[in-house]
């Protein structure tokens, strides 16, 4: 079976570890004062949208996102010069990253940080926090002294907020399926007309692809899958329409395995991209989805726990109001006092009667001592029984109230190890474009492009529908980000 996804080789990522060298250089001036270093603000200018973020916030983002923010691995100013010594007054300039995508990232990570610190998981368990959840520092829990060597990696997915980072980089190439004729013999003008036509086609194709927001729709467009399906049709011969439909929706084993892993971790087959943007002036579409792993740190799990706890308390409240008070112990004590008094009186009488029957007196004395011991045992058992009946029932353990989340352990393969999967696909579509010309012979797919002659060129634009074949290359990057663990 094919690999699910190909791990990114460190040799192919020139700036992995991103910003590490620059961080080490600047760390020297903050020695002895780590909190000032981590809390120092960084001014980001993303397409003239200004954001202020702490160093810990920035460095807690996963590597796949840092590479998108800083492709060269360094901070750049407005002029494109490297900022070697970053200060509070410096402005880090980011050109090719959409501001709404950055806001989407910060929204998800801020919520995860809030759950980590304001709703600690250890309060659900009978374990001390020091042994259950390691202490973390900073906005996203970045701490140089933090270590997970003592924690089981499986438990990390239950103890810490985790985010599945899925990114798609899509490149598309447009191939018109028609021929062109020109009314002018000037080759330079004809090239301008053709360039304008292709620009309109690329813009329309970009809008079409951007509107396709379904995440898993791209998996079905692989050329390899289409070739396998065509081969199956040839081998089976003529198929019914129902068989054709079921075959067209079948994924390969690698794609199906990847889809099942994501769907078992919070995604659904209908999940859409959280952010999908086309780069200005390029046939490139970047998509991002941040899926919070459905573990014990989520708000949904807390709601289930609180509902189950309230239901359990409501069911056991009547029995708590009818607990038996320890009356039997008082009765036993009174019986014990009476027994002691009677034994004292009997002993005095026997002493006055003399020693006429010493054997009989000893037997009676043993009998009285046996009764006294029985009374003591009865008193002890009665008190224990009363205390047992008066003790309220204890709240069940966490997983007795709420089922333990079923988390796919294979996600740990992508923790701190971003992985990629690349495939090609093609699609034949029809696009509506505005061009300087019209169909000369639509049956033969011939378009005539005409050079505009009016003062207002836009008046000579005509809307036509043209067939286009799209060649699409998709690159998926998958990474697991765990909040609060360095």
Swiss-Prot record:
Q: Name one GO molecular function term.
A: RNA binding
Task: Indicate the transmembrane segments per the record.
Answer: none
Q: Disruption effect?
A: Negative mutants fail to enter the G0 phase under conditions of carbon limitation.
Which keywords fit this entry according to its UniProt record?
Cell cycle
Gene encoding this polypeptide? Answer: WHI2
Feature: compositional bias, Low complexity = 20-31, 227-250
Report the protein's function. Plays a role in the coordination of growth and proliferation. Required for entry into G0 phase under conditions of carbon limitation. Involved in the general stress response; acts together with PSR1 to activate stress response element (STRE)-mediated gene expression, possibly through dephosphorylation of MSN2.
Q: Where is the composition biased (Polar residues)?
A: 1-12, 347-358
Q: Which domain of life is it from?
A: Eukaryota
Question: What protein name applies here?
Answer: Growth regulation protein
> What's a GO cellular component annotated to this UniProt protein?
cell periphery
How is the quaternary structure described?
Answer: Interacts with MSN2 and PSR1.
| Natural source organism | Saccharomyces cerevisiae (strain ATCC 204508 / S288c) (Baker's yeast)
């Amino acid at each position: 079976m094919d690999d699910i996804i190909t791990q990114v080789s460190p040799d192919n990522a020139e700036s992995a570890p991103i910003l590490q060298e620059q961080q080490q250089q600047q760390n020297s001036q903050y020695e002895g004062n780590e909190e000032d270093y981590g809390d120092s603000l960084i001014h980001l200018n993303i397409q003239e949208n200004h954001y202020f973020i702490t160093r810990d916030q920035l460095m807690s983002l996963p590597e796949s996102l840092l590479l998108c923010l800083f492709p060269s691995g360094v901070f750049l100013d407005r002029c494109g010069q490297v900022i070697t010594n970053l200060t509070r007054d410096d402005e880090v300039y980011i050109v090719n990253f959409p501001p709404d995508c950055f806001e989407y990232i910060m929204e998800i990570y801020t919520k995860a940080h809030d759950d980590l610190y304001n709703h600690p998981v250890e309060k659900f368990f009978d374990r001390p926090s020091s042994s259950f959840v390691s202490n973390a520092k900073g906005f996203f829990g970045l701490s140089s002294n933090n270590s997970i060597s003592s924690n089981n990696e499986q438990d990390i997915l239950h103890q810490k907020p985790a985010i599945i980072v899925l990114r798609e980089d899509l490149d598309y190439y447009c191939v018109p399926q028609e021929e062109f004729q020109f009314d002018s013999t000037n080759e330079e003008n004809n090239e301008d007309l053709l360039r304008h036509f292709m620009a309109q086609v690329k813009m329309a194709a970009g809008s079409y692809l951007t509107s396709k927001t379904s995440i898993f729709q791209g998996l079905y467009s692989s050329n390899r899958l289409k070739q396998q399906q065509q081969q199956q049709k040839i081998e089976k011969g003529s198929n019914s329409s129902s068989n054709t439909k079921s075959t067209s929706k079948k994924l390969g084993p690698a794609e199906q395995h990847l889809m099942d892993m994501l769907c078992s971790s919070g995604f659904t087959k209908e999940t859409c991209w959280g952010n999908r943007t086309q780069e200005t002036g390029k046939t490139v579409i970047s998509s991002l989805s941040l899926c919070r792993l459905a573990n014990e740190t989520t708000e949904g799990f807390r709601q289930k726990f609180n509902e189950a706890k309230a239901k359990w308390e409501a069911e056991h409240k009547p029995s708590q109001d009818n607990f038996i008070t320890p009356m039997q112990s008082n009765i036993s004590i009174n019986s014990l006092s009476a027994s002691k008094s009677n034994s004292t009186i009997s002993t005095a009488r026997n002493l006055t009667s003399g020693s006429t029957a010493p054997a009989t007196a000893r037997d009676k004395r043993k009998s009285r001592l046996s009764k006294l011991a029985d009374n003591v045992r009865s008193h002890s058992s009665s008190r224990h029984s009363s205390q047992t009946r008066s003790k309220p029932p204890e709240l069940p353990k966490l997983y007795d109230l709420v089922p333990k989340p079923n988390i796919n352990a294979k996600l740990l393969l992508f923790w701190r190890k971003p992985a990629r999967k690349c495939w090609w696909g093609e699609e034949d579509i029809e696009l509506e474009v505005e061009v300087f010309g019209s169909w000369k012979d639509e049956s033969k797919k011939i378009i005539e492009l005409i050079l505009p002659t009016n003062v207002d060129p836009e008046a000579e634009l005509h809307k036509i529908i043209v067939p286009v074949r799209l060649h699409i290359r998709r690159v998926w990057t998958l990474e697991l980000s765990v909040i609060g663990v360095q």
